[in-house]
Amino acid sequence: MVRPFFTSQPREAASIEREEFYLELILQINSFINGIVWGPIMLFLLVGTGVYLTVRCGCLQARKFGFMLRSTLGSLFRKTDKASGGQNLTPFQAVSTALAGTVGTGNIAGVTGAIFAGGPGAVFWMWVSAFFGMMTKYAEIVLAVKYRQVDGDGTHFGGPMYYIEKGTGHKWLAVLFALLGGVACFGIGNIAQSTEIAGAMQSLVGLPPLYTGILLAILTAFVVIGGVKRIGQVASYLVPFMAIFYIVAGVAVILLRITDVPAVLASIFTEAFSFRAVGGGVFGYAILVAMRQGFARGVFSNEAGLGSAPMAHAASNTKEPVEQGLWGIFEVFVDTIIICTLTSMAVLLSGVLENDINSYGSNGAAAAAAFNAIQIGRAHV
């Protein structure tokens, strides 16, 4: 409940009480909005769309998985045309740009938070979300490339706001998406990322958050002032190194606790469908919490259905929408099935769940503690 503040207190005390009042009010508003945005209805709509597309496309993500790998990873070893003119990107630069926005906080802090809130079972529902999310992102990218625009110098640009207007004819809906998408960029794309980075840096090396923020702003400025072409070039070098480094580190951590892996995998599946005793009765509340956390963090991580990735893919120089759409399936597979799973295994193998999440300061710090605990041999299950 929101506590009132009293002006009869000394000025300094009243100021502190006022700050606490507004902070608590903001937290309550945020919690209310969060309950709607990441509530059951919205999450089932997102996942339900993926289910619908999976059925209509004949389970393309599984049926053509090998073809997808040959068309994406395989294309990196074949001679292809470079981006032609303007600020266009190669297909790989486009997917690297999209992955740069998805691989990050959601894979580490988001997954850790989901496990703390929903238990090991949240990992299973995260996998389910990713499987159907592959088709959602595939469809987003196909539409973005099909309905993209070309300016005077041959530069491609597009995204959901363009295919919403041209595909449905409802311009107001496209404008609404653009406005809400701009707002979401601050919360999902900037604040969440920088906050977790700052929290982890402060926890690990004692660097004040202000200095971390300044450093991030400077590094980001050097990239974005070069336009979409510079972003694509930087992402094409940074993302593969970042992903490979994390995958190697994650695999190494798992190998250190390889004997405990079967038990952890078993807990993921059993907890996904477990009925716990609550208040003397047995309810499926634990399953609902695990599903919500798994679905929410899966979507937050791979951004399937959010509309951000199609903007990067629309700038690709590819001429075939379906070909670029396969990169969307690849994105979700790498982001969630591989990287998020590695984070999940590290957290579950480390024993950090025995402590309260608040004792670590942030989800990112808890994930770092998990990796550190295993590496120095102090973990126990």
Question: How should these model regions be labeled?
Answer:
Residues E19-G101, T105, I115-A122, G133:
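N-terminal alpha-helical transmembrane segments of multi-pass membrane transport
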Residues L45-Y52, R56-L69, E196-M201, P208-L216, ...:
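Membrane-interface loop-to-helix entry segments
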